[in-house]
Amino acid sequence: MFSHIMIGSNDITRSKKFYDALFAAMGAQPGTEDARGRLAYSHNGGRFMVTKPIDGKPASHANGGTIGFVMKDAAQAEAMHKAGVANGGRSIEDSPGVRPHGAYLAYLRDPDGHKLVGVAR
């Protein structure tokens, strides 16, 4: 459905540390940086990118927005969550676990405040 998802960051070096750890927990490679300083990650056929805003204004998170990553199982979702928290993210909402609809969800925010979730169905 999407070619990529791109989010803004106020500190690309901090974001690289955070997302490299997050994607490693998902079994993906570290991000690559292009000539413009944008980070790119590949996972399950999709691309996730991080950049400083092109307009030069501070990056901000989407109020009401969530970026969900497909996990192969609950253990991978838990590993993603732990890696994120250990690298500057913070756990949010309920603790990682199975929700009433049967999916295992692990919510956290990245260092810039973007809401992320690892989802194992």
Regions found by a protein language model. Give the residues of each.
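Hydrophobic pocket/interface hotspot
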Residues: 15, 19, 77, 84
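Core segments of cupin and vicinal oxygen chelate
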Residues: 7-48
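Conserved, structured core segments of small domains
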Residues: 48-54, 103
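Short secondary-structure boundary/capping segments
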Residues: 40, 56-59, 98
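A structural feature recognizing the 12-helix transmembrane core of secondary solute carriers
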Residues: 29-34, 38-42, 69-70, 80, ...
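Absolute protein N-terminus
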Residues: 1-2, 121
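Vicinal oxygen chelate
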Residues: 3-10, 59-83, 86-121
